[in-house]
Amino acid sequence: MNTTTSAAGRSLKVLVAEDNIINQRLVISMLTTLGHTGVVVGDGEKALKCLAKLKFDAVLMDVMMPTLDGLGALSAIRAQEQTTGAHLPVIMATAHGEPGDAAKYKRAGADGYVAKPIEIDQLNAELKRVLGIK
């Protein structure tokens, strides 16, 4: 496991939309280990409010959350981008992974996908890929 090399060679700011506190802590720990900063919200509605106030390099979005699920939040993010013209990379995450999920979420507008439990190398690789970092 290569946990000392960050995805960008610089610190990223990642919005983590995840309702499970254990998963929140694990992802924040991984991001910190990679040299990044994470901001946690517990549902899609809070994610949209946070995105309206703060700038992020990427979003890690749980699929199944209360209030507004990850796909609903993703749809709202992509609709907002039509107005702003700015693209925000979104990586979807789910514990109920099935074959074809990555393609399904890509069709819904996601840039990337990780299956839970998330591994640090998997997260790092997907951040690099969606941000176009070699």
Residue ranges and their predicted role:
Residues 65, 97:
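Receiver (REC) domain active-site loop signature in two-component systems and cognate sites
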Residues 28, 118-127:
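C-terminal output helix
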Residues 18:
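Conserved acidic carboxylate
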Residues 40-49, 70-72:
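Helix N-cap/capping motif at the beta->alpha junctions
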Residues 55-60:
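Active-site beta3 strand of CheY-like receiver
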Residues 25-33:
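Charged docking surfaces used in two-component/phosphorelay signaling
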